[in-house]
Structures are given as C-alpha cells and as structure tokens.
Amino acid sequence: MSKLDNSNISKHLGKSSEYACFYDPSLLVREPRSSNRTHLDLQDDNLPFVGSDTWNGYEVTALSNNGLPFFCVVKFTYPCDSKYIVESKSLKLYFNSFSMTKLGDTQEEVFASIKEKAEKDLSELLETTVIVETFSNLFCIKSERTMVNEWNLDEESQQSHITIEDTYPIEDIVFEKYLEDPSLLRVVDAEVPVSRYHSALLRSRCRVTAQPDSGDVFVYIKGKKTVDPISLLEYIVSFRDECHFHEEICEAIYKRLWDLLEPEELNVMCLYARRGGWDICPERASSKKLLHSSLGDASCVHVKMPRQ
C-alpha cells in the first residue's frame, strides 16, 4: 500500500505525552478514513462492505466520591461508514484521564458516568453513533451472550475456519515479501461453495510510530472462485512491515479479495492483540447477515484469542 501523509494525524502519536489524571475530552483526536481509502479506490458513498470497528479496553478506572477506585472493561463499537476513526493513543490518554476523577457514590454510578461521557464524547468526535458498555466481575456473568469463545466458528453454520499455517504444507515456501503485495494472491476454482480461512500470522505496524501490531485474521469467501490458501498466507505475511492502522489493514485485505474474486459473499475480520490495554477488532462484510453479531454488539464480551 502507499505511504500516507502523517503530518497532521495526531498531537500525541510518536511524541512524549503527559498522562492526564482528570477527565479531559479534549485529548481525543480523529483521523478521516478517506486518507487511506483513496489509494484503495474506495468511495465513502459507495463502499463495497458494511461492518464496524470494535475496541476493547481492559484497564479503565475511576474513583467513587469517597475516593475508592473501581476498574472495568470497556467495549465500544461504531460503524465503518463513519467519516472518521479515533486515533488510538489519544483514546488511551482520554480513558486514562478518568483515573483520578470522582464520578459517583457507587460502582454502578461510576460506570454509568464513564459510559455516558464516553458515548457523548466519541459520538461527537466521530460524528456517528458510538455505543459504549462497561463490564465488571466478568467471571460472574451468566448471560450466554458473554464470555463465549466462538471466533473460529461461522455463526450460522458453526463450521470452523481452517488455520492455513497448521493445515497446508508450507515448509518449502519461501516468504520474502514483507510489504503488502496483492500480486501474491492466486485465484483458483472453488471446489466447495464456501471457503473459510484463518491465520494467526497477521502483523502490521503503526502508521506513525512503526510499533508492531499482531493479530488473527479470518476470511470467509462464497463464490465460484476462491483464493489459493497458501497464496493467501503469503499475502497476509506481506503486511509484516506495512505501516497502517488496524482498520486500514482489514479494508485492504477485503478490497483486494473483492476485486480479485468478485465473490457472492465476503467477510474479513481482524482481531488484533491488545497494546496499551486496548485491542482493536475491525470487521468488513459484503452484507450485514455475514457480520459476527457478537463482535459488533457492545453489550457482549467474549473470551479472546490467546494473544488478546
């Protein structure tokens, strides 16, 4: 992918920052999605996908009015057709600013205040609807919508994705491309109507700091043509030194496969490992019915992939 201009991207990324301890929404920074979509020939008013960006934060804390700290997990989601994304370091600084802020008499009041403020601030920043939920005592929650590990299953058919590096002979394959190279992808006739692939070898780098981001990628393809799985793995590995945000990586994978295969249905989901207490999980699909409802549902927290 093309190198993008980062000169105006953030007042925080790549710089030393003081950690504010009191609630400060001015810390939040947004980035237009168009800065990456243009070179992928994606138009905001005619996207070939639907989906969402899901964020999970594991170290969010604030104080009660008598000074007692409470900790919670925060999950929030917003749609991929929003004009902006939130820049990750600014988000981490923003949620850290709750840490010494007194927000209520009880745990419930504290968490409700975090939810209310974060929904308002993020929705205004991104000019879209952001849904925020807070969770505590996760291991005591009995809801079947919570703490379920189903990422490697197609929700409708309950069929597993095939982990490419564990299934196909790759010992003699030479991997030497570490910048995104869609020419690696090879089209083959589909022997079965649906192909489901997974790899735990996704790695990319932050667009500004070049810090590494590792994750799992899941690909669902339905159509007369599919992609050779080893070539798909080669392509996934080629992101290893690619400097782009998580959302941009997911959209690049989706767009390359969409253009190449012209499938009936396509879904790409990237579950990145947490860094700085947060993980980012973008998903793009050709129709809403293909989306993992649990991922885009802010009220549902799942057991993660091992690295998350």
Q: Where would I find each of the regions flagged by the language model?
A:
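N-terminal intrinsically disordered, cationic/polar leader segments
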Residues: M1-Q308
